[in-house]
């Protein structure tokens, strides 16, 4: 079976055959895809917490309440739900930050949360609890089984499109409507 190139800095789009799973109509940003496996963050499944409520949980006083006022925290995936991951742009210099591509970074440090509370963090953020993970080769097998479509990174999809529209918009970038999708793979 032929293996796909690295999917880092791409999006996965859930296919209709995942409707009975945790990943129903999800879009996932792939943070890492290497010889150890794949790690991604769901960018369109909302948690019941908002960003200000999360900051309050850490006893951080929000000095700029208009920042992120109604922004929901997202469910990044079913793994490690008590850990937070923040995708943001620009990258900046945070304590525990992983620079990605296109001036995007993922940060997991409290100094970023403090910057969010005091209004000095970047405006473009996506806050997730938990992540999605696959063992080496597992995601490639799922793509071959027609569980996922892939598209390159798109800043607007990550930061600007409303969460409830991201799946549809992601499909539209491929010229696909949900009604035209089949659950059958197009190969043997």
From Swiss-Prot:
Transmembrane segments: none annotated. InterPro entries: AlgH-like. One of its GO terms (cellular component) is cytosol. Pfam families: DUF179. It comes from the Bacteria. Gene3D superfamilies: VC0467-like (3.40.1740.10). HAMAP family: UPF0301 (MF_00758). Belongs to the UPF0301 (AlgH) family. This is UPF0301 protein Tcr_1827. It comes from Hydrogenovibrio crunogenus (strain DSM 25203 / XCL-2).
């Amino acid at each position: 079976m032929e293996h796909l190139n690295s999917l880092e800095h791409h999006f996965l789009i859930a296919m209709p055959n995942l409707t009975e799973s945790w990943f129903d109509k999800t879009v996932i940003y792939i943070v890492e895809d290497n010889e150890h496996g794949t790690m991604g963050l769901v960018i369109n499944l909302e948690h019941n917490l908002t960003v200000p409520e999360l900051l309050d949980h850490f006893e951080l006083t929000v000095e700029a309440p208009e920042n992120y006022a109604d922004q929901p925290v997202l469910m990044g995936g079913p793994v490690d739900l008590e850990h937070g991951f923040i995708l943001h742009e620009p990258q900046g210099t945070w304590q525990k930050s992983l620079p990605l591509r296109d001036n995007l970074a993922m940060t997991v440090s409290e100094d970023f949360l403090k910057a969010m509370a005091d209004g000095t963090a970047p405006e473009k953020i996506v806050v997730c609890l938990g992540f999605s993970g696959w063992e080496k080769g597992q995601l490639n097998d799922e793509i071959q089984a027609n569980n996922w479509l892939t598209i390159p990174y798109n800043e607007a999809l990550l930061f600007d499109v409303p969460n409830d529209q991201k799946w549809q918009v992601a499909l539209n970038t491929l010229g696909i409507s949900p009604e035209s999708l089949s659950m059958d793979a197009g190969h043997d």
